[in-house]
Amino acid sequence: MKAVCWHGAEDVRVETVPDPTILNPRDAILKVTSTTICGSDLHIYDGFIPTMEPGDILGHEFMGEIVEVGAEVKRLKKGDRTVVSSIIGCGHCWHCNQQQWSLCDNSNPNSWMLEKIYGHGTAGIFGYSHAFGGYAGSFAEYIRIPFADYTATAVPKGIPDEKLLPVSDAFPTGYMGADLCHIQPGDIVAVWGCGPVGQFAMLSAYLLGAERVIGIDRFPERLQLARDFAKAETLNYEEVDVLEALKEMTGGRGPDACIDAVGMEAHGQGPEGLYDKAKQAIRLETDRPHVLRQMILACRKGGTLSIMGVYGGFVDKMPMGAAMNKGLTFRMGQMFGPKYIPKLVEHVLNGDVDPSVVLTHRLPLTEAKQGFEMFKHKQDQCIKVMFQPD
Amino acid sequence: MSQSIKVEKTVTIDKPAAELYSFWRQFENLPRFTRHLKDVRVISDNRSHWVITGPLDGTVEWDAEIVDDRPNELIAWKSVPGADVDNAGSVQFKAAPGNRGTEVKVVTVYNPPGGVIGNMLAKLFGESPEQQIGDDLARFKMLMEAGEIATNDGQPSGHSHSKD
């Protein structure tokens, strides 16, 4: 089959590789009908994610049709159309039972790698480095789905892929970002980053009862989408002082909750931005935490920071004094896929949400390299690139 | 005389002690989740024969006898005289608080011999026998909770194309 393999920073190649096979009784094989680049794939593309090996197949946001099931797959059958969670959970460990799917104890065969850097291993993720399990990704014609009964959710036929594809990863990630805010009546939620995850976080904040939502970015088309799709108010951080503007918009209180939908390659400004960029370039700091710092200062006293933007390693110059003395709550994590996916599928089927609006560009899988370049540099006002293997 | 090496490792498994105990008590099950233990053959109620494989198909073998057996709580075993390597081990099952399952603690002690067998064991267990026992226990947990051991052996990649 054809697959998109990583060979180093900014080096992805379409190659012919063997088809996947069932390796464990709870596996299924999926024919990928649609898959899309996630912002976190750019961290891999840019070479910031360790334990990648040349030849690894990328991709973790996808859907398709089940073509084969292992002996212990009970709920799914050949022919089922499914949306697949980017995060892999066994469904039987204590964490999965608590619905904390990304903390699964049993889905990461290379758990020991994470134990060394994080203290404990966490769940496997498709196409996201060997430390996260080394699972082959979805930028391929076929993919093996471990623990398929939980990792994949059956969806009806007759609704286009575009409307369901973001339910694999971007939508539940944004939804969890809002869910972690414990939104109360009257709450104002600010979201840093108006990419796909940020769009879904803003929209989800309203679904969960926010009074007002404010989106922060610098790209006009993304801010426009935040206004049109998520019905958010917007701030362009290149045009205004974000801290001042947020205070003015919230009666001086600051947003009740702040969501980070940006992550480790945040675009900082001024000397602070240069400092992080330089330190990250020579690997003295793995992540650029500009957004985190700003959220701590912006957030209402006693408010909540919800951190979804992916971080991998270390950050420095964190204003912990501000966080501590303002009594902030930090909540974060990789998304708990199967906890949210069925509910979000319902929202799509009911017509509450049309996630397809974030998918601005479609390419065949063979043009993956162009897709990455277009997405990375936001060419042609690109927000999200969808690949179709056929 | 070399010094004996003792390794202790604990994992919490979300299953009742009775289920974990009875799986472990059938020593033939152990090679299903241990990396180096190739075969355990039960000879009698409290005696079994254990085989470890090493590099170049070398093997280390011994007979072990059960020295303590408390159903659903503890199993302890010890190699009998004449073993390739003198060793002893135990596994203990203790309820974790608040319905968090069972804490499973493994203790192994062995006296590394010299010569060929000593070299082989050193290669097998490297500098971190704790890591090896920990990985074995992680696989035991996967098998008990998830019913299978997570793997990627045999999946596709473009690795074979990466050298051109």
Model-derived features with residue positions:
Chain B
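Short hydrophobic interaction/assembly module
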Residues: 52-65, 69-72
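Short beta-strand micro-motifs enriched in acidic
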Residues: 43, 67-69, 92-98
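Hydrophobic ligand-binding cavity/cleft-lining segments
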Residues: 1-49, 53-55, 134, 139-164
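Short beta-strand segments that buttress and anchor functional surface loops
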Residues: 48-55, 75-82, 106
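Beta-strand/loop substructures that line and gate deep hydrophobic ligand-binding cavities in soluble
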Residues: 60, 78-137, 141-142, 146, ...
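Non-catalytic surface loops within mature trypsin-like serine protease
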Residues: 15, 54, 68, 95, ...
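Intrinsic-disorder/low-complexity, polar/charged segments enriched in Ser/Thr/Lys/Arg/Asp/Glu/Gln
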Residues: 4-10, 47, 61, 74, ...
